[in-house]
Amino acid sequence: MLCKCLVTCLDYKRPVPEKQSFFKNHVKNLSILIDNTPSLPYYENQRTAMPLKRKVFHMEVILGIDIGGSTTKIVGLRTDGSVLSMLRVRAEDQVTSLYGALGNYLTSNGLTLKDVRRVVLTGVGASYVEGDIYGLPTCKVDEFSASGTGALALSGQDSAVVVTMGTGTAFMWAEKGGTVRHLCGSGIGGGTLGGLCRKLVGMERFGQIKKLAAQGDLGQVDLTIADITCNPAPTLDPTLTAANFGNLAEDASPADLAAGAVNLVLQAIGTMTVLACQCCDTRTVILTGSMTTLDQVKPNFENFEKLYGIHYIVPENATFATAIGAGLCSLKKNAVD
């Protein structure tokens, strides 16, 4: 009989739930199931007990790979759409990041090239890749379709404004069934945050900025409504920002500056989500991308929710939404060879 072992994925450690359809459990299964051949010789005919050549069992894995401006995200999907595991790799150039992510993923999960049914590329860096990767069938999905499909699948929504907060920020309208429409984009995003913090505090790595900003005091950086009036409008909370970096103290610490930069970027994105919702006549926004892991995301978008009545959703594994969507689009035959 086949024995099955569970190998915990690289980025996440949690109890492994029962294998379910991707659309039912919204990617809560974050481990990979590998079929191993028996340790003893395989006997096809138990009566003769003649040892035959061991049978090797291969999985059929679809790899969705999102090649972004600074990081590459890779997700393995079973043919039923359920997630195997996820991995994120940073590299100086996108092609190196792609091949590094693929090799790392296969090794970490005990897979071989024969286990891969198809590679599906998306993201800005996909344009630099031509032909098949390592001889594997390779196709491409446009980033907007992948982002919209992944966001809806992860959140369980039928329609929503989808915001991908990557190096820049993209705004889309997505509907269940494959309709994804690009609304607009903004140059303000993770790249903005990295550039500002490199100049302000000498850091540009996302993990470093995230840790530093969590210790900062916005009162040392931003001007609030309470700072400029004692009689604000009834609908406005006095603690809301009136001007980003409008009250910069001379003794502001690096942590304060980092917090101010994070606040500026998130509030700019939040303002654009309000306009996008008005354009699409909706009050549901799904936030995806690496920046969703910032501690300041929740309080910032809670303020927008109170002000404008918009429901913001940050689904589990939002960082990998586009890579997951690429794989799902491939299963729906929306990929381009």
Segments (PLM) and residue ranges:
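Glycine-rich phosphate-binding loops at beta-strand->alpha-helix junctions
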Residues: L121-S127, L275-Q278, T282-F304, T319
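Short beta-strand-loop/turn "lid" adjacent to the catalytic site in phosphate-handling enzymes
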Residues: S85-A91, T107-E143, V180-R181
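Glycine-rich phosphate-binding loop plus the immediately following alpha-helix
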Residues: G178-C230
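Glycine-rich phosphate-binding/hydrolytic loop that grips phosphoryl groups
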Residues: T149-L154, L193-C197, Y312-D337
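Short glycine-rich, Thr/Ser-proximal phosphate-binding strand/loop in the N-terminal lobe
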Residues: V61-G100, V180
